[in-house]
Design a protein with these regions (language model features):
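Ligand-binding pockets and gating/stacking loops
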Residues: 8-433
């Protein structure tokens, strides 16, 4: 696999120690930068004739700037709500999704709070949590393990929106090239390249073994605080070792036939990239190349490529309820949800919609106010009996954490755990059984 078909995972260790340890000598070998096989994949109608593997899947779509509340949330509760302007784009699938009101993570910070969308925990406050700000998709990916070529796929436009995080607090950046994603999914490397890659993986495994030995030799010389830091570091090494082993297992297995023409590496408008990514993600899920995928829409999404839009996306989000900007903002949000509608159609045609839990939303509710309260959240597919519009309590003492919904989603996926993020239990408003 070519070098550009990888992502970089950084492992670092901060030993803040009063113990008599030569920290400089030890850390000289721990600033490790490993290139691991690209954990990403893609999809489309092209394989509609293929009978897909029946495994539960998760696909989460995050939009950095949220969706204008006045056009997103319905006024009525239950199945008989009148579609809001934004939801009219997915009206065909009304029975296939649920919209949630008054759910959030009780965080603030505007743009700085968006990174908590799939984790429930802001990166800035993650040190106080045993699993840091690990995101829903990465917990699900751990559950998948080596059962799929890519435990998870993180895709997106541009720089994405800081949505996916490991349990050690490391951000997983999105692959932002449809061509690179296509190659990772469907282009089989020549045997000569696979031999070289296997040698690289073996060498990296040897380096990790050496680091593990050096780290363990310190355990008896550290105080309690530093031992905790060391345990976190050892956990990071074990995670990477596990990924290296999975990479070796899949190295010589043939990749599926995509059923579509190869995607070339060329300059495209953002509005051209989004449907390409959605097709690739559908194919990735359908071919069981992955069972967990995410897609990130950034603050810098190029809305001026749309007819009738003259403002940039960030500028539109600061509408102050001005009529001109709200009109153009609706054009942008209509486009995004028209692509979501197209994605739902593709998942149905691929016969995997009932096996795939699709999450659409944001860690930002209203970009104009930089609010992280009352987040826009839609959940579709998954074979659930959807409830239309669920309105949770608005009073502070009765509010339901969004993490409760994420915990229920993880349990639906097969993950056995009783808490996630800042959850207080599972979400009782929607039956996941």
């Amino acid at each position: 696999m070519a070098q550009n078909d990888k992502y970089i995972l950084f492992i670092s260790m901060n030993l803040i120690s009063s113990s008599p340890v030569n920290r400089r000598n030890f850390l000289r070998g721990t600033g490790l930068c490993l290139a691991l096989p690209f954990l990403e994949s893609g999809a489309s109608k092209a394989l509609a004739a293929v009978e897909p593997a029946r495994h539960k899947k998760i696909l989460a779509i995050g939009n950095h700037l949220g969706f204008y509340p006045g056009a997103f949330f319905p006024q009525e509760e239950g199945m008989d709500y009148v579609s809001s302007p934004t939801l009219k784009n997915v009206e065909k699938h009304r029975k296939d999704f649920t919209v949630f009101s008054h759910l959030d993570h009780d965080v603030s910070g505007g743009h700085g709070g968006v990174n908590s969308f799939l984790s429930g925990v802001r990166k800035q406050e993650s040190k106080g949590f045993p699993e840091k700000n690990v995101s829903l998709d990465q917990i699900a990916a751990e559950h998948v393990g080596s059962a799929a070529r890519f435990p998870s796929i993180t895709a997106g436009i541009g720089e994405g929106t800081d949505m996916c995080w490991t349990r050690t607090g490391v951000r997983i950046p999105p692959v932002n090239s449809p061509a690179r994603l296509f190659n990772a999914l469907f282009t089989q490397s020549p045997q000569s390249e696979r031999i070289i890659e296997r040698e690289r993986l073996t060498h990296r495994g040897s380096v990790l073994d050496a680091l593990m030995g050096s780290a363990k030799s310190l355990q008896g010389r550290l105080n309690g605080f530093d031992r905790d830091k060391l345990d976190q570091y050892l956990t990071s090494i074990r995670e990477v070792e596990h990924r290296l082993q999975m990479s070796k297992e899949w190295l010589d297995r043939p990749k599926p036939e995509p059923g579509i023409q190869p995607i070339t590496d060329e300059q495209r408008m953002h509005i051209e990239e989004m449907p390409l990514f959605f097709d690739l993600l559908t194919l990735a899920l359908q071919t069981d190349s992955t069972r967990v995928a995410t897609f990130e829409i950034p603050l810098g999404f190029s809305t001026t490529d749309l007819d009738g839009v003259s403002y940039g996306y960030h500028g539109l989000s600061h509408h102050s309820k001005g009529e001109d900007k709200l009109t153009e903002l609706q054009v942008a949000e209509d486009y995004i949800f028209s692509q979501v509608n197209r994605l739902f159609n593709s998942l149905q045609e691929a016969k995997i919609f009932d096996d795939t839990l699709v999450i659409v939303g944001s860690g930002m509710s209203d970009g104009s106010r930089h609010s992280n309260k009352d987040l826009p959240v839609l959940m579709a597919g998954g074979g659930l009996k959807h409830q239309g519009h669920i309105v949770s309590p608005e009073e502070h003492q009765k509010r339901v954490p969004l993490s409760n919904l994420w915990l229920s989603a993880l349990q639906w996926f097969g993950v056995e755990r009783d808490d996630f993020g800042k959850s207080t239990g599972t979400f009782s408003g929607l039956n996941f059984s």
